[in-house]
Regions:
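Walker A/P-loop
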Residues: 18
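Phosphate-binding P-loop
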Residues: 1-4
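P-loop (Walker A) phosphate-binding loop of NTP-binding proteins
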Residues: 12
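Hydrophobic anchor at the beta1->P-loop junction of P-loop NTPases
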Residues: 9
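ATP-dependent NMP and nucleoside kinases share a basic, alpha-helical "lid"
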Residues: 99-104, 110-131
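Conserved substrate/cofactor phosphate-moiety recognition/catalytic segment
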Residues: 25-90, 96
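ATP-binding Walker
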Residues: 15
Length: 131
């Protein structure tokens, strides 16, 4: 059995990625596993999912939602600490391993930085990926 196909959905929060993934699962003849960043975020211990956590706190080491000002507007920014970055790297490689075992995958992610796309390219380099 060969590697599975990978469909990559990238977009901002609430852009409809999960809805599109669900529709694709219904329409495609083969089974596609929907794997989302949210699943890995939710799998982190609660103390590593911060809300404006200070430097050095567990929430700042994982995924930290930080309020900030941009052009006079209050917005939120997602900051990943060392544990959060480790989880993201592991997630990308887990997705690649899943596909290499012959499973078709729909990735539902948000590429916060260009380095994340580069890391996906390394992890998925030998697989067929549709963006």
């Amino acid at each position: 059995m060969g590697a599975g196909n990978v469909i990559f959905l990238n977009g901002s929060s609430s852009a409809g990625k999960t809805t599109i993934a669900t529709m694709l699962q219904q329409l495609l003849p083969d089974p596609y596993q929907h794997i989302a960043l949210d699943q890995f975020r939710d799998g982190m211990p609660g103390r590593f999912r911060g809300l404006n956590s200070p430097e050095g706190a567990p929430g700042a080491r994982g995924l930290n939602v930080v309020p900030t000002q941009r052009e006079g507007q209050l917005v939120t920014r997602i900051a990943f600490g060392d544990h959060g970055e480790q989880v993201l790297r592991g997630m990308r490689r887990a997705i690649a391993a899943f596909a290499r075992e012959g499973n078709h995958v729909i990735i539902d992610d948000l590429l916060f930085r260009p380095e994340y796309l580069h890391d996906y390219a390394l992890a998925l380099e030998d697989l067929d990926v549709w963006l």
